[in-house]
Amino acid sequence: MIQAAGIYLTETDKMNITAADFGLNQIKTEGVQILTLFDTDRMAAKILVLLPYQTEPEHWHPPVGNDPGKEEVIRGIWGDLTFYIPGEDNMKEGFIVEGKEKCYTMRHEIAIGPGDQLILPPGTKHWFQAGKRGAVMYSFSTKVTDLLDQFTDPNIIRETKIEE
């Protein structure tokens, strides 16, 4: 999908794409594919990919020490993408993952097309979902602290745990 969106990938890039299922074991429904372009002590850039109708679960980036939390700018590249943030419930395009009504509380819908941007201040609850074609987007942010993200769904595990 990334290459179909017109972004050149090196062989190393292809090897570095990761998939996050958040410990839910239903990646086609809830998850995201991630290519980290760079991640320094101050800023980061990623390409995020959602498969058709895939949803990244509701979360927010909390304060860490004296840092107010990750600030993020999303820029649509390709596909059908909808973000859900605080605000009036105007949800009509997307859907709540079956049985997860309490885990997706943000219902203010914003469609993000190619070239559209959305700025998410630190601590902003959000989730996003692809439509029938899937979606590709850039995520530009301040320092990445993703392992500290908070999720509305109590069953989410952000870090993979290996059981013996």
Place the predicted regions along the sequence by residue.
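Short, solvent-exposed loop/turn positions at domain surfaces
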Residues: 44, 70, 98, 106-107, ...
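A short, N-terminal "cap"/entry segment at the start of jelly-roll beta-barrel domains
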Residues: 1-47, 64, 98-102, 164
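Short, surface-exposed charged micro-motifs
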Residues: 47, 73, 127
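Glycine- and acidic-residue-biased ligand/ion/polar-headgroup-sensing regions
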Residues: 51-52, 69-91, 96-99
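Short, charged/polar surface micro-motifs in flexible loops or helix N-caps
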Residues: 41-43, 52-56, 80
